[in-house]
Every structure is written in C-alpha cells, then in structure tokens.
C-alpha cells in the first residue's frame, strides 16, 4: 500500500471471489488519513457510473492483456495518477509492458511477482496541442508606409505639363512616312497606302475639298459615319480639311 497517500481517492478492483486478503488490503488502505476507497468487481466496472479522472490510485487484479478494461482504467485515473496491476496471466514482462504502453500508460515498472506499476501522463486522454513547424523569419515590411505627414509626396497634377495636355494634330499622329521617305506601314490605316498605290497606277485622285457631308459627322470617324460613307476606314479629320480619296473608295460596296 506504499502507493496510497493521504487525501487520495482509491479504486480497488477485485476478481473472482472475495477472500480474507482482499478485506485486509482494503482495511489497511482505510487506515491512511483522509483516504476514500471504492471497492468494485472487475466484471461490473463498466456498469458503474464513475467519472473520468476521478481516482488518484487504482489497485487492480486485472490482466494487462485485457485492452478494453486497461484503456478504461486510464480514463478513470487523474493525470499523473498510478495504477497497480496484479497480472496472474502467463504474459511475459515484455508483453505486459507493451500492452500498458499501447493503452496510454507511461513509466511502467515491473516486479518478479507479476505486479506492474504504471502512471498516467500529465494530460487528459484525447487532449491536443497545436504544433507549429513553420520557421518564422524576420521579414522586413517593405511595403509598409509610415504615417508621417511631413513626408514629401508627389502631386499628380504636376506629372503633366501644358505640352502634354495639348491635343495632338493629325500630322503628329500619322505614323507612315515619318522617316523622310514616303513609305506606308505594313498595316497602314492612315490612307497613305491607298495614296501611294493610286500614284503608282497613275490613277487620278478625287479632290473632296469642296465636298459637303449630308450628315455633317463624317470628320468624326467611322463611329459617326453612314454605311455608304466614302470616308469609311479613314481616320478622323478636321472639318473642311482636304481629304484625297481613290477611285475604289468612291464606289459603294452594295
């Protein structure tokens, strides 16, 4: 009874028939001050309504190979509580130790008289703890802005000058023929390709300087032109500006 101390709550489990040695052991436990003892038959333990982590010490005449019962005893013990098994089976010390470890006991001590003392870990069965395996690195907050009112900031209104705000002219937007030699680009859309093609074929170009638009919106671009407008496909131009059209452009598609 060296495992029982003052103020302990003890569970005594017996198997078979009640003999005089059981009464002697229970009476010896009761002589320890402030000790509460519960005596229970092994076969009726699962029917008893004992709570989890209720006992400080359990004295059990239980075979360590009874995994169901051994696991139940782990739950009945308080953390760091001890359970003393008296195993009369033919199990070896190695086998008994393995059975107790698998049930959840630690610090198992065996004696030659088939008595095993096992301890419950210092935590409840089923408890969990968060494990952090990620290594934290000290990363500088590169994009963090300090709340400093004296810091110089760029005014977006100063990013553009008056020249940048000026509306570009048609000649400045014309890409073809800007290298000195009049040569149309591969995907010319400013009309130079048609102009050079007409000159190469010797075709006369139609002067539309005196032409008047019936809708008055031809110069705005294709989005504002009629379906039969001869200026379709040409860039926008200024009102009254001289525009040269080829013979093919003067013919309607339908």
Swiss-Prot record:
Comment text on domains: The C-terminal domain binds 2 Fe-S clusters but is otherwise mostly in an intrinsically disordered conformation.
Q: Specify the superkingdom.
A: Eukaryota
The name this protein goes by in its record: Anamorsin homolog
Under the heading Pfam families, the entry gives: Anamorsin_N, CIAPIN1
Report keywords, A-Z: 2Fe-2S, 4Fe-4S, Cytoplasm, Iron, Iron-sulfur, Metal-binding, Mitochondrion
- The residues listed in the UniProt record as binding [2Fe-2S] cluster, with positions renumbered to this chain, are 176, 185, 188, 190
Q: Where in the cell is it found?
A: Cytoplasm; Mitochondrion intermembrane space
Q: Which cofactor does it need?
A: [2Fe-2S] cluster; [4Fe-4S] cluster
Traced from the root, the source organism's taxonomic lineage reads: Eukaryota, Metazoa, Ecdysozoa, Arthropoda, Hexapoda
Entry's Gene Ontology cellular component terms: cytoplasm; mitochondrial intermembrane space
Q: Where do the record's region annotations for Fe-S binding site B lie?
A: 215-229
């Amino acid at each position: 009874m060296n495992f029982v101390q003052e103020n302990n709550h003890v569970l005594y489990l017996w198997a078979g028939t009640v003999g005089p040695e059981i009464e002697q052991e229970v009476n010896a436990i009761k002589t320890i001050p402030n000790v509460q003892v519960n005596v229970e038959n092994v076969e009726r333990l699962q029917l008893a309504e004992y709570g989890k982590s209720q006992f400080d010490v359990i004295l059990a005449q239980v075979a360590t190979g009874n995994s169901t019962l051994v696991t139940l005893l782990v739950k009945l013990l308080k953390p760091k509580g001890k359970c003393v098994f008296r195993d009369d089976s033919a199990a070896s010390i190695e086998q008994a130790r393995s059975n107790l470890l698998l049930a959840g006991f630690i610090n198992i001590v065996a004696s030659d008289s088939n008595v095993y003392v096992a301890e419950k870990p210092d935590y409840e069965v089923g408890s969990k703890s968060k494990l952090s395996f990620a290594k934290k690195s000290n990363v500088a907050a590169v994009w963090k802005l300090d709340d400093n009112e004296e810091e110089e900031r760029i005014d977006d209104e100063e990013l553009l000058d008056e020249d940048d705000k000026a509306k570009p002219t048609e000649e400045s937007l014309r890409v073809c023929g800007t290298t000195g030699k009049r040569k149309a680009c591969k995907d010319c859309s400013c009309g130079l390709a048609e102009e050079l093609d007409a000159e190469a074929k010797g075709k006369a170009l139609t002067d539309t300087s005196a032409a008047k638009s019936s809708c008055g919106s031809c110069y705005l671009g294709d989005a504002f032109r009629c379906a039969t407008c001869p200026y379709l496909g040409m860039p926008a131009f200024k009102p009254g500006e001289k525009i040269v059209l080829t013979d093919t452009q003067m013919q309607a598609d339908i």
